[in-house]
Regions:
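Alpha-helical protein-protein interaction scaffolds
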Residues: 215, 244-251
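PAS-family sensory domain signal
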Residues: 20-76, 170-178
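Sensory/regulatory domains in signal-transduction proteins
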Residues: 46-69, 74-161
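Regulatory hinge/linker segments at domain boundaries
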Residues: 171-194
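Histidine/lysine/aspartate-rich catalytic loop segments that bind and position anionic ligands
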Residues: 155-175
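Recognition helix of helix-turn-helix DNA-binding domains
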Residues: 205-240
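Short alpha-helical "packing" element that flanks the helix-turn-helix/winged-helix DNA-binding module
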Residues: 195-202, 241
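Short, low-complexity N-terminal regulatory "tails/caps" that precede and couple sensory modules
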Residues: 1-19
Length: 251
C-alpha cells in the first residue's frame, strides 16, 4: 500500500527552510492564476518544503469532482484517492528516478528541465488518462526544487507511462524504462516543413483536396506528408498527432 511519505526522498526533500518571502509567493501564485484563466490545462503548484500543494487551479480536468480548495487541502492524499494502486507504485518509482535525474543538472539548467508522463485519474466508476508535466519554478540555495509547477491535460496515448525528460533548447530527450529502471537518451522528433502544415490544416477541418489546393501539392503528396508525420509521432489519428506535436513543440 502506497504511503504519502513514499513520494518524498532525499532528492526532493527540502530540509532547510527557504526564505518564504510573501511578496514572491503572492506574485508567483497570481501569475499562475492568470495563466490558468487562459489555458485549457489544469495547473497546480507543489511546495516541496511543506510537502503540500501551494495552489490548485479550478479547471475540473484534474479535480475529480472536488473543488480546487478541497484538492489543495488533500495534497498528496489526492493521488492515493484518485490514482489506481498499481499506478501509484509507478509514480513512486518515477518520482524517485526523476528527481535523481534532475539532480544531474546544474542549478541554471534545472530551470530548463521538465518531465512528462501519463497515468489514470479515477472518480467513482470513471477513469481518464492524463498527461502530467512537472517543471521547477523556484529552487533552494542548495539547488533543491522548492516549488514545482504541474500541468495536466488529456493524454494522447492509450496506455500509462511514456515518461520523457526534456531540457529546453536540446533536440534530444530522455525516456524512462520501467523494465530497465533507467533513463535512455533518444533522438528528438523532427518533422519536415510540410508535415506540421498538413497536420495544422487537417486539424482546422480541411479535406485532403482543400489541403492540396492550399499547399499547391498533389493529393498523393499530402497523404505522404500526413502518413510520415503519423509514423514519426507514433500515432494513428489526427487528434493524437496534434496533441503529440504540440507537446513536443513542433508547430
Amino acid at each position: 500500500m502506497t504511503d504519502i511519505k513514499d513520494f518524498f526522498i532525499a532528492s526532493n526533500t527540502v530540509h532547510n527552510a527557504p526564505d518564504y518571502d510573501s511578496n514572491v509567493l503572492s506574485t508567483l501564485i497570481h501569475t499562475v492564476e492568470a495563466f490558468a484563466r487562459v489555458t485549457y490545462q489544469s495547473i497546480y503548484l507543489i511546495d516541496y518544503y511543506k510537502q503540500e500543494y501551494l495552489y490548485v487551479s479550478d479547471n475540473p480536468l484534474f479535480l475529480c469532482g472536488h473543488t480546487a480548495k478541497e484538492v489543495k487541502e488533500l495534497g498528496y492524499s489526492f493521488y492515493l484517492e484518485h490514482v489506481p494502486e498499481d499506478e501509484q507504485k509507478m509514480l513512486v518509482e518515477l518520482n524517485s528516478s526523476g528527481f535523481k535525474f534532475f539532480d544531474t543538472f546544474d542549478n541554471v539548467d534545472k530551470y530548463q528541465c521538465s518531465m512528462s508522463y501519463h497515468f489514470h485519474l479515477k472518480s467513482g466508476t470513471r477513469s481518464k488518462l492524463i498527461n502530467h508535466q512537472l517543471t521547477p519554478i523556484l529552487l533552494t540555495d542548495e539547488g533543491k526544487i522548492w516549488v514545482g509547477m504541474c500541468i495536466v491535460s488529456l493524454s494522447s496515448h492509450k496506455t500509462v507511462g511514456h515518461v520523457e525528460f526534456h531540457k529546453n533548447g536540446l533536440h534530444n530527450y530522455w525516456k524512462y524504462s520501467f523494465e530497465g529502471h533507467r533513463w535512455k537518451e533518444c533522438e528528438g522528433i523532427a518533422l519536415k516543413e510540410e508535415e506540421p502544415e498538413v497536420l495544422r490544416l487537417s486539424a482546422a477541418g480541411l479535406t485532403m483536396v482543400e489541403i492540396a489546393d492550399r499547399m499547391c501539392r498533389s493529393i498523393d503528396s499530402i497523404k505522404f506528408y500526413k502518413r510520415h508525420a503519423f509514423d514519426k509521432l507514433g500515432v494513428t489519428n489526427i487528434t493524437e498527432a496534434i496533441s503529440r506535436a504540440t507537446l513536443n513543440k513542433l508547430f
